[in-house]
Amino acid sequence: QPEPEELQAMLDSNVTAYYRLVKEFLPLLAPGSRIVLIGSTSGIRRDRGGIYGISKWALRSYAYALREECKPMGIGVSLINPGGTFTETRKKSSEEDRSLLETSDLGKVIALTFRLSPQAVLEEVNIRPLKGDTY
């Protein structure tokens, strides 16, 4: 098992950072604004992901609570959970299977959240590679 400090660092990176950003900027948002949080399919599958999965599960819980908090203000909160994505980091580590999600796919889903009318919110989206996640 990882050390508690490793868990804390992961939570700070994947949950606390979002919490602090939202706390700082929420008062500046007008009705009809959007908040988009990037989770992970590792936060849905509780059987995998270790401390990363724990942190993304916690982010998912935060997104649900934040959505309820923001409803009366007319602010939409979306959680996007990508699966395995072909990023610059993966390109450098190895020539990964190109069946992973492209970052542009993730960008298109995020953009969609901002194209909706103020009366609609894309609450949660899970986007995975067609051939499945790579764990």
Where in this protein do the model-derived segments appear?
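Conserved active-site helix of classical SDR/Rossmann-fold NAD(P)-dependent CH-OH oxidoreductases
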Residues: T16-Y19, K56-Y64, E68, I75, ...
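Short-chain dehydrogenase/reductase
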Residues: L11, V15, G49-W57, S99-L100
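Catalytic loop of short-chain dehydrogenase/reductase
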Residues: R34-A58, Y64, E68-K71, G84
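PG/GG-rich flexible active-site loop of Rossmann-like NAD(P)H-dependent oxidoreductases
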Residues: S40-G43, L79-F86, P129-K131
